[in-house]
C-alpha cells in the first residue's frame, strides 16, 4: 500500500480553498452574455472552444493532490447541476466558491463548522421557498424562445428553433441534437411513432422514386414471434384482403414461405401490404410492441397471453391513418388508439423513468414516451468549421435542457436578479435563528446570493458591488441587462432563467460547500519518484 500524505486543520482548508479557487476562476469567466470563451487543449485533433461551465470543469485536473480534491468537489457541483437541470453549471460553481470562501473566513475566525453548515442548509431552504414564490409558469411560445436564447448565449436563431421544436413535439416529445453536413442549422420533425426497422423486401415499395411504401388507412398486425409458414397466417390475410384495406405486419421476423406469399400477393394481386421486423430486443422489444398496439388501438398477438395467429380477427388489428416505411425505418402517423389508454401508458412510462436508476434505461424510456406522445425533433447544427460546430452544439444542448427545465418548474427574472430578490426575505429570517454560528452560516448564503450578478457584471467590465446595490434598490423584476448595459424589467426584456436551474445550482453549491467547510483532514497518496524507480541497465555509460 502506498504511503499517504496527510494534511490537517488550517493546512487542509488552505489546500482545498486553492483548488476550489483555481477551478472556479477558469469556469466563472464564461458567465453571462459578455462571458469569455475557454480554449481546451486536446490530446488529438484541434483544441475545443467552449462557454459551457461543466465542459471547462470536467477538463481540470490539478497537479497537487490535496488542491485537486477541492477542485474535484466543485467539479461535482457542476456535474450534479448539469445532471439535474441540464444547465446552470457556471452559476453553481460561482455560488459554491462564494459560500466556501466566506465560510472559510468564519471557520478560521473560530466559528463552529457544523453549526455553520446547519445555518447554510436552513438559509438555502428559505431561499428555495422564496424562489418558488417568485417563479411564474411558462405559458407562451415566446417565453420558451427567450429562455433558449439566453441559455444559448443570446443566439436568437437557436432559441427560435428550440421553441419551434417544443411546440411541434410537446413537452413529452424528444429533441435530439446532431451535427449537420452543411453550414445551416435546421430542424427536422418526425411526427408519430418512428422506429429504425425498414421493409423486409424492396418489392413492398409503392413509390419507386423515393423507395418508400406508403399505406393510407392501414391495418396493423402486431405479433411477437417469427412467421415462416403460411398455414397459421392465411386466415387473417384473407380477412384483410376482403376488407380492401392495406396491412402493415410487425413481427419478430417474417421469412420463407410467409414472406414469399406476401411478395407474390403484392406483385400479382395488388394486395397493399408491407412487412417489417419488430424494433428493439428482449423485454424492450415486447414493451415497444405493446406501445405500438396501444397507439394503434390493436392487440399484441402473443402466445404468452393465450393468443394464436390463426385465431386473429380484424378487431384485434391496430389502425393508423398513414404508415410510411423506408429501407431503414418505419413511421406510424396518427394511430387510432384510445386517447385515454395512450395517456395511461404515458403515465406508466413516466413512473418507470422516475423509479429507474440507470441512465441508459431512462434514455430508452424517454424515447418510448416521446414516440407515444408527440414525436421526435432533430436539430441539425451546421457551421463553417468543426471547432465552431462543436461550440455551437454545446450551446444548443444547454438551451434545450434549460427550456425543458423552464417548462417543468417555471421561469424567473434572469441575470442573477432572482437570487438578489431573495436577500430581504433571508435577512428577515436570520434573527429567528437562536444559535449565533447558525446565523453566521445564513449570512454566508446571504452574501453568496449576489455572487452570480456580481460576476456577470465583472465579465461585462463593470463593478459588481455597485451594480448589485442598484438592482436591490429597484422593484421586483428589474435587473441588470449586461448585454445592453442597462437596468430593465427582465421578464419583459426576455432575460429569463428556469426556476429549476437556479434552484438546483443553489442546492448543489450549498451541499458541497457545506461538506468542504466541515472537512478537517485530507489524505492523498505520496507521488512516486519515477526517476529513481528504474534500475540502470548493466554496462550503461561504459565506452566500448
Curated annotation (Swiss-Prot):
Compartments (UniProt record)? Cytoplasm
Q: Which is a Pfam family this sequence falls into?
A: Cpn60_TCP1
- EC main class here is isomerase
Q: What is its EC number?
A: 5.6.1.7
Q: Name one GO biological process term.
A: protein refolding
Where does it primarily localize? Answer: cytoplasm
Q: Does the keyword Nucleotide-binding apply?
A: yes
Q: Which domain of life is it from?
A: Bacteria
Q: Where does the chain bind ATP?
A: 30-33, 51, 87-91, 415, 481-483, 497
The record's InterPro entries line, in alphabetical order, gives: Chaperonin_Cpn60_CS, Cpn60/GroEL, Cpn60/GroEL/TCP-1, GroEL-like_apical_dom_sf, GROEL-like_equatorial_sf, TCP-1-like_intermed_sf
Q: What is one GO cellular-component annotation here?
A: cytoplasm
Write down the chemical reaction(s) this protein catalyses.
ATP + H2O + a folded polypeptide = ADP + phosphate + an unfolded polypeptide
Q: Which UniProt keywords apply?
A: ATP-binding, Chaperone, Cytoplasm, Isomerase, Nucleotide-binding
The GO terms this record gives for MF are: ATP binding; ATP-dependent protein folding chaperone; isomerase activity; unfolded protein binding
Record-stated family? Belongs to the chaperonin (HSP60) family.
Function field: Together with its co-chaperonin GroES, plays an essential role in assisting protein folding. The GroEL-GroES system forms a nano-cage that allows encapsulation of the non-native substrate proteins and provides a physical environment optimized to promote and accelerate protein folding.
Subunit:
Forms a cylinder of 14 subunits composed of two heptameric rings stacked back-to-back. Interacts with the co-chaperonin GroES.
What HAMAP family has UniProt attached to this entry?
CH60 (MF_00600)
Q: What is this protein called?
A: Chaperonin GroEL
Q: Which organism is it from?
A: Chlamydia felis (strain Fe/C-56)
Amino acid at each position: 500500500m502506498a504511503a499517504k500524505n496527510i494534511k490537517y486543520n488550517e493546512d487542509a482548508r488552505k489546500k482545498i480553498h486553492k483548488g476550489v479557487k483555481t477551478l472556479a476562476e477558469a469556469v466563472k469567466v464564461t458567465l453571462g452574455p459578455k462571458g469569455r470563451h475557454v480554449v481546451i487543449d486536446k490530446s488529438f485533433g484541434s483544441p475545443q472552444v467552449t462557454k459551457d461551465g461543466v465542459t471547462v470543469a470536467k477538463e481540470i485536473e490539478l497537479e497537487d493532490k490535496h488542491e485537486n480534491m477541492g477542485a474535484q468537489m466543485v467539479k461535482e457541483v457542476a456535474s450534479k447541476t448539469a445532471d439535474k437541470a441540464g444547465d446552470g453549471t457556471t452559476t453553481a460553481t460561482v455560488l459554491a466558491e462564494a459560500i466556501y470562501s466566506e465560510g472559510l473566513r468564519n471557520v478560521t475566525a473560530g466559528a463552529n463548522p457544523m453549526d455553520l453548515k446547519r445555518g447554510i442548509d436552513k438559509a438555502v431552504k428559505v431561499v428555495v421557498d422564496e424562489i418558488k414564490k417568485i417563479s411564474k409558469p411558462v405559458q407562451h411560445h415566446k417565453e420558451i424562445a427567450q429562455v433558449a436564447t439566453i441559455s444559448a448565449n443570446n443566439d436568437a436563431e437557436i432559441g427560435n428553433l428550440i421553441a419551434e421544436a417544443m411546440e411541434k413535439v410537446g413537452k413529452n416529445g424528444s429533441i435530439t441534437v446532431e451535427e449537420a453536413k452543411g453550414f445551416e442549422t435546421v430542424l427536422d420533425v418526425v411526427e408519430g411513432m418512428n422506429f429504425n426497422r425498414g421493409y423486409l423486401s424492396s418489392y413492398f415499395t409503392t413509390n419507386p422514386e423515393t423507395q418508400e411504401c406508403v399505406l393510407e388507412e392501414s391495418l396493423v398486425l402486431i405479433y411477437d414471434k417469427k412467421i415462416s409458414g403460411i398455414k397459421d397466417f392465411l386466415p387473417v390475410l384473407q380477412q384483410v384482403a376482403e376488407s380492401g384495406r392495406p396491412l402493415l405486419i410487425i413481427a419478430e421476423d417474417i421469412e420463407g414461405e410467409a414472406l414469399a406469399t406476401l411478395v407474390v400477393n403484392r406483385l400479382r394481386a395488388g394486395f397493399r401490404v408491407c412487412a417489417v421486423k419488430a424494433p428493439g430486443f428482449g423485454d424492450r422489444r415486447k414493451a415497444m410492441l405493446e406501445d405500438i398496439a396501444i397507439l394503434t388501438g390493436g392487440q399484441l398477438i402473443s402466445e404468452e397471453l393465450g393468443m394464436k395467429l390463426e385465431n386473429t380477427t380484424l378487431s384485434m388489428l391496430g389502425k393508423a391513418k398513414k404508415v410510411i416505411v423506408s429501407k431503414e425505418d418505419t413511421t406510424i402517423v396518427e394511430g387510432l388508439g384510445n386517447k385515454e389508454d395512450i395517456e395511461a401508458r404515458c403515465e406508466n412510462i413516466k413512473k418507470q423513468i422516475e423509479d429507474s436508476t440507470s441512465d441508459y434505461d431512462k434514455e430508452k424510456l424517454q424515447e418510448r414516451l416521446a414516440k407515444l406522445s408527440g414525436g421526435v425533433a432533430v436539430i441539425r447544427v451546421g457551421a463553417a468549421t468543426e471547432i465552431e460546430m462543436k461550440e455551437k452544439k454545446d450551446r444548443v444542448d444547454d438551451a434545450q435542457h434549460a427550456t425543458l427545465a423552464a417548462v417543468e418548474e417555471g421561469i424567473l427574472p434572469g441575470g442573477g436578479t432572482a437570487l438578489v430578490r431573495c436577500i430581504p426575505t433571508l435577512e428577515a429570517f436570520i434573527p429567528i435563528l437562536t444559535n449565533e454560528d447558525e446565523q453566521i452560516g445564513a449570512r454566508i448564503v446571504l452574501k453568496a446570493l449576489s455572487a452570480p450578478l456580481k460576476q456577470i457584471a465583472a465579465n461585462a467590465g463593470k463593478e459588481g458591488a455597485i451594480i448589485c446595490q442598484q438592482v436591490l434598490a429597484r422593484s421586483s423584476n428589474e435587473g441588470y441587462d449586461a448585454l445592453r448595459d442597462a437596468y430593465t424589467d427582465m421578464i419583459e426584456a426576455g432575460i429569463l432563467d428556469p426556476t429549476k436551474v437556479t434552484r438546483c445550482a443553489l442546492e448543489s453549491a450549498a451541499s458541497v460547500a457545506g461538506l468542504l467547510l466541515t472537512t478537517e483532514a485530507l489524505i492523498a497518496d505520496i507521488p512516486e519518484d519515477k526517476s529513481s524507480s528504474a534500475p540502470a541497465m548493466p554496462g550503461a555509460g561504459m565506452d566500448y
